[in-house]
């Protein structure tokens, strides 16, 4: 059995606006002394698998600064403080693509990287998505909206063309029929 570490303190290091960096100090009952660990407090975010009445999936393609290149993605973004995740899903789909559809259904909720991050990522399925609004991109966004068949999306994931791991997960939940949206259940949290 793995014993729980005891938190001895926390020190804020820097606030970058969209994320904060802190140093937490822990002690383990089987180890001597205390250890410091860096933790990233990022805002929680949502992902949206939007499916049209023709069963196509709404994808976006945009430049990603971390890798210095464009990437295929699904609509996603941060949850604003005080905003319910389900409302953020509807907003992000509308802002990034102009699409709207049926009420969101939960697909999955995950911890992006619990080794160093404290946030959650919640994914929703929106069925019967159609183009209904003008896009409302953030100042640093330039987005291409593309409809792909479910088979094309499967091939993109298999080939590595769709490489964003946290965005693959909700797509795979949808494409394989696992998760609350497939069974009618609710999110784990």
Feature roles, as predicted:
Residues 2-4, 37-42, 47-91, 129, ...:
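Conserved Nudix-box catalytic region and its N-terminal flanking loop in Nudix hydrolases
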Residues 2-5, 70, 81, 106, ...:
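Nudix hydrolase/Nudix homology domain
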Residues 10-49, 53:
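Acidic, metal-coordinating catalytic segment for phosphate/diphosphate chemistry
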Residues 22-30, 113-132:
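Active-site-adjacent beta-strand/loop module that shapes the phosphate/pyrophosphate-binding cleft
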Residues 23-25, 50, 125-127, 147-149, ...:
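Short, well-ordered beta-strand micro-motif
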Residues 82-87, 96-103:
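Beta-rich strand-turn-strand
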Residues 100-113:
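Acidic/glycine-rich phosphate/pyrophosphate-binding loops and surrounding catalytic core
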């Amino acid at each position: 059995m793995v014993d729980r570490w005891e938190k001895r303190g926390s020190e804020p290091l820097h606030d970058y606006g969209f994320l904060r960096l802190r140093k937490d100090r822990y002690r383990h009952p089987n180890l001597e002394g205390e250890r410091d660990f860096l933790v990233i407090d990022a805002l929680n975010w949502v992902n949206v698998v939007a499916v049209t009445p023709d069963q196509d999936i709404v994808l976006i393609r945009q430049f990603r600064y971390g890798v210095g290149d464009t990437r295929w993605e699904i609509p996603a973004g941060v949850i604003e403080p005080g905003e319910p995740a389900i409302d953020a899903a509807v907003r992000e789909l509308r802002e990034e693509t102009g699409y709207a559809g049926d009420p969101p259904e939960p697909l999955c909720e995950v911890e992006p990287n619990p080794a160093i991050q404290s946030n959650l990522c919640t994914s929703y399925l929106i069925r019967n998505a159609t183009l209904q609004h003008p896009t409302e991109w953030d100042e640093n966004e330039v987005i291409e909206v593309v409809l792909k068949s479910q088979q094309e999306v499967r091939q993109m994931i298999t080939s590595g063309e769709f490489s964003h791991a946290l965005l693959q997960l909700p797509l795979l939940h949808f494409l394989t029929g696992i998760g609350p949206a497939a069974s009618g259940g609710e999110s784990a949290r």
